[in-house]
């Protein structure tokens, strides 16, 4: 008994150690008098700490729980052990951080990676429910032995010191771990000779790989420190349920406990995440006819299942061996659907088919998710783990070296580095045609297949600039595993795959799928020719949130799910489709109870099922269980990616929902270690990874917006109206309002809104055919469907080129990581070069002609080149492989390749896409089945989008295939073609009124449609005769055209029906009404004005009709007789609202901040809808300062609530939203009068009087200017500033206009006198103020402020563009002009001079300072005799003042003409 009690005492110590006590407590037998701890000084403490860091696996028998000493004092009693540093955006700081945190990789077996992230409480909870199970001592001892195993016997390989040095310390890559195995641990390493045979047959087939044979690596184990104690302990506790269950959970919960080591994550985050491999095991086969049960009320933790490593490790990786199978309990929230192997696999061929939808990368293995076809033709969800994938490395030999030389040098080194027994390699001839200099166009490379799964250093990549005596460049070192798989297996997007030799027993409960298999040989996976895809299970999702003001966090109140279980993408989705199931989950908004009668009222009035929960955690647990049961392939929603998935994930994380991984198909036990702590980009990556397996179809992301270009705010109601042509008036639900907690009708109305939004989201996605189109695009590009759904056009271009060039035997460029890109940027900044990460190309783009501004009343033809840039690439055979370019100077324009050069890869790819689209369009014309016709239309759209976007990869700086010389050549040929087209039109006496990149607008001079078309067809024939592939065609026919500026016009487009009858439709491009910052009222007014101006009415009559219409609008605005929603203004935030430096003066920013404070989700990219309101009469009192426009801006929903008494500001909307855009529309119309326009809108006409007739400072060469000697001073000085004087006695300021009548001053016989205080001005006081005013105007001129002449831009700056007068604003084509020109300054000086000119004062030839209708117009006027008398009496004073002005006029260079420069030619 004493022996047994001693062993039980040891067991208690072991449990105490595992529960948080220091592991040193478990030391065997110790006397009670032994000290628990030692007292040491700081120096000794640091010394011991250094020793502990050198042996970080210091815990005895920790069963892979994950205790590692990282040098940080930790409280082991805490349950949460997922601590990590905060992420930062500074790449430089990350690099330095990595250097400090590099971990020594050891040659452990797979159990060394089995480190759980579960808390102790979770393990004990599972232990209580486990059955007693016998664990063989040998198995336990083997596992323990792996943690204490000694160093391996090292092969004594002599390697070149230079190459070894490069591999061990490469500053440009992650290849940082030491690879030396000769100088191992002195206590455990022994020199051993290794006999190796290297056989290279130069004449052998390239399909044969070279192998280097090595003797097996021997393991030499050290004695366990407490082996005897553990052995004795296990004799008695082998049947202990606690230990058995703990062992089981440690193994099973290892599966995917940490974030994946994806390449993109490696570029962003520290490399100290988990090194775990994927640990999978097949669960026991069960019948398909099982009952689906979801126990929502269960409060117990879900039971877990064990996972073991898939056995199919790559060649040469003997360290990754599978563990034995363990049984597990069934998860109560898991869908109990399991499929037998016999139901899936064809016994004759040992194959089965899977349609793959999505993927994820986990610890150097690839997992595909999709649907497997059963023998009864039904489909179930499936997961396939692919092992044995290899990275293809290409080593380029130095001159005089061969692949054999590289093999003898690099293969032993790679084997040593990655712990491999053998590596496959072979010589292979490859081509290269990209932008790296000094790379031959074709050469013999050493192709090396390096497994992604290696016993050690698996996270290290080979740097491309690695070199030695035998080679000087390496390609393919940083390729990711998904890219390698699809390129090597030639898989083009989602399709049916034939999978042979799959293992149905190696994976168990690793996912939420019905079928789980592993494949050890990637070559056993091949795409099939089957075209019909399986039906998809789609789930539409809508979430309502509430801001918790105490924690400043968004909480979830309601979730609505609508299930569509058989969505076929091979045929159009019916417009009236109804969900197969509809369910709403809701919890009380503010307390623990609902309004009385909610359940009954919801059952009566709301569609579908409504489930009530007491708290948010129970609701989210049920939501995860329903996802598990429904098992959707696609999750549809509005703003899922940017808003609601983020809120959902954070709430499940904060509430510790154990089944959170149901939102994806990968079973997870713990959250990513750094989730919620890093920046938003990393959180977005984590959420995408958690959702892997289920496609996220967000109708409001970049892809959804590209398919709905007519939307402006992309609100759900707007998208519904534009796409489905149905109205939905959204309700603004604010659950902070107590009415939703107290009023059952209000709560029911809020739930109805969520249900409506859920169903609308699905309907919009089906109408825009988002899933169908993105699938076609993905099949063309060969990338992942999820990437296309996210809207990454650059990713599609990259993959289609990767596939095409790889098939043609080319080495493709390596993907540049964020670190290397940032390093290049720093180097360029040090060299004073432009940053390389700028997405804008630094070369000339398309040619844009200066427009013939004004109204064109004749028919105008729009002649457009079909796909100009793709056609240029084909026409002139422009490709990486054909254009000879200077790779040392990328700014040098290359020449067009000769005609005898073979067709390049890129032109051939584009030609294939164009031909396929042409064939599809032919089928469309003859197809009678409407369903097939729709499918053909989608396919031709996908082909068109793919072909037209191919050029973009050449000029996109961050593109993998960026080639600036090729992009320059393409755009240069485009400019040349457009110019030649214009010259051809002018040679035919046709007027080109405008041209832009790939089209020209030609004024035919005809007022008859048939004659205009005849001219267009003749012009088309002449242009097309010049080219082989380039084609121009009539794109549009304008009956009338109003050209405002570059890229800004309005026109009446003529459309012919089947009977040949023409109808006109207004087409607008680039004008104010197309911009979201102008309200619907402004757009309605602008459309009415354009329709009136472009009509067949007389111009004078049309203008009068416009003025009358605007007067009616003014009355309606002032009397508030227009709907509130007509006043809404939309502004998109380009960054977080708190990040705007001048946010106080920006209405959208102020509204966004108030919305965030109220609990709404507002971030960069959000579109803010607001209304400018009128200041209250109480606030508008004389002693109350006027509120700014930003302070008077309110969200639309606030204005629509009548109790708020918010009224739109009539003055603001009439002046800023109506007057400004209408003036710009009419400024080119003859007889337009800006003063008349201002009067029609009730604005102050005096503000616009000086603008009548235009104010161009004499710089517009198109306007006729009268001679300076023929105009009066009133006309000449209409834009000058009045001279203001200040009384030296009372400081009263007043305008001085010479010897004239005034209410503020008088010119007496004694001089100038202030009427307010009767104080006389001395000559010095007068002249000093004159000089001060003159100097202020001179300073304004020399300030050099520039302003864009485009009224829609209006940018004001002092910076001068390197392109001269080009506007600095992105996308603006205006011209920068001086805001205060030399002519204005000269006229200002002349005006001051005229004020003191005695003769002009006598004749009263002065600019009047008052108008007759002014309120301060003087009642008494000076007589002619008194003016003359006063002038003579004050002549001395007047001449003194004039002398000051003359001094500056004499220095003004504008008043002089250099005759010598004009007539210099006559002197020669």
Swiss-Prot record:
Keyword Manganese: no
Entry GO terms, CC: alpha DNA polymerase:primase complex; mitochondrion; replication fork
Ranges for region Disordered: 1-34, 71-135, 166-205, 256-275, 813-837
Swiss-Prot/TrEMBL catalytic activity: DNA(n) + a 2'-deoxyribonucleoside 5'-triphosphate = DNA(n+1) + diphosphate
A single MF term (Gene Ontology): DNA replication origin binding
Biased composition (Basic and acidic residues): 1-12, 71-80, 183-205
Documented effect of changing residue 868 to M: Increases rates of C-to-A transversion substitutions
Pfam family for this entry, one: DNA_pol_alpha_N
CDD domains membership: DNA_polB_alpha_exo, POLBc_alpha
Segments of this protein annotated with the region DNA-binding: 1246-1381
EC class (word): transferase
Modified residues (Phosphothreonine): 172, 309, 313
One Gene Ontology biological process: premeiotic DNA replication
Zinc finger (CysA-type) residue numbers: 1287-1317
Segments of skewed composition (Polar residues): 166-176
Modified residues (Phosphoserine): 31, 82-84, 169-170, 240, 274
Signal peptide positions (record): none
Subunit-structure text: DNA polymerase alpha:primase is a four subunit enzyme complex, which is assembled throughout the cell cycle, and consists of the two DNA polymerase subunits A POL1 and B POL12, and the DNA primase large PRI2 and small PRI1 subunits. Subunit B POL12 binds to subunit A POL1. POL1 interacts with CDC13, POB3, SPT16 and MCM10.
Similarity section: Belongs to the DNA polymerase type-B family.
Miscellaneous section: In eukaryotes there are five DNA polymerases: alpha, beta, gamma, delta, and epsilon which are responsible for different reactions of DNA synthesis.
Annotated protein name in UniProt: DNA polymerase alpha catalytic subunit A
